[in-house]
A protein has these predicted regions:
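Detector for methionine-enriched segments
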Residues: 1, 15, 51, 101, ...
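N-terminal single-pass transmembrane signal-anchor helix
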Residues: 1-23
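Intrinsically disordered, low-complexity regions enriched in Pro/Ser/Thr/Gly and acidic residues
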Residues: 70-245
Length: 245
């Protein structure tokens, strides 16, 4: 009886660890698959359009060293920028975006097998569930700042991903959230947040939710890089996952 009791205690202690390790392996393999599929899809869309696509950030960063000239008094994030030498930022400071609309149309309509598209209102229309949290919610929980709250209207905030941004569900369950709205020419940002296992749990940043950024030059899109807006406790950054492939 004592032996059985000891075995039971050991099992109770080790099972959660084993389960957690198994989940990490499963999610790591899923990340590899989705990163590969997403990358191949991007380059396939570019090849099918048969031209160097201008929809990326520069491979080597901005064209000048940018400095902030005005901060938001409420959220303390930068509102306006200029080059360090005082000159204004050029329209292509961060990259070239002229072809983003035609590229995304090719990517999501002719390359990826999309089973559901939400132009906006992703939560109400079923592309996302209530379990998803925006980066502002995650950051406020992990690093609360009573003096300056996190901006609820910036990047992949809760309001943006659930109400304002476009989302797609692919045939394998993968969820893709665009930074901004599909075919919005006023805001062409080649950045995409991807839930690698769809609506399945854990639905956490740094576990199964990661952000990809397209990088390139005047010769077209060259690279799919990681970009990190948030990583929940115990999770990994997108770059860590890419390097751990």
């Amino acid at each position: 009886m004592i032996t059985l009791g000891v075995i039971g205690v050991v099992a109770a202690l080790t099972m959660p660890v084993i389960t957690e390790n198994v989940q990490k392996i499963v999610l790591k393999n899923q990340f590899k698959k989705v990163y590969s599929t997403f990358s191949q899809g991007v380059f396939q869309a570019q090849n099918q359009l048969d031209m160097p696509i201008a929809c990326s950030y520069w491979l080597n960063g901005g064209l000048c060293e940018a400095v902030c000239t005005e901060y938001d008094p409420v959220y303390n994030n930068c509102k306006t920028w200029q080059c360090k030498d005082g000159s204004p930022l050029s329209a292509d400071h961060n990259g070239i975006r002229e072809d983003c609309m035609v590229f995304e149309e090719e990517l999501f309509n002719k390359v990826f097998k999309v089973v559901k598209f939400c132009e906006d209102n992703a939560l109400a229309n079923g592309c996302l569930t209530s379990e998803y949290r925006g980066t502002d919610k995650v950051k406020a929980e992990q690093n609360p700042n009573p003096e300056y709250p996190y901006n609820p209207n910036s990047a992949f905030s809760d309001t943006n991903i659930k109400n304002n941004y476009s989302s797609w569900i692919l045939s394998d369950g993968t969820v893709i959230i665009k930074y901004g709205k599909y075919k919005d020419t006023s805001k062409s940002v080649p950045v995409y947040t991807v839930d690698i296992n769809g609506h399945k749990k854990p639905n956490k940043w740094g576990y199964d939710i990661f952000t990809f950024q397209l990088k390139g030059d005047k010769g077209g899109i060259k690279k799919i890089d990681g970009l990190d807006y948030a990583s929940e406790k115990g999770g990994k950054t997108t770059m860590q996952m890419i390097q751990d492939k």
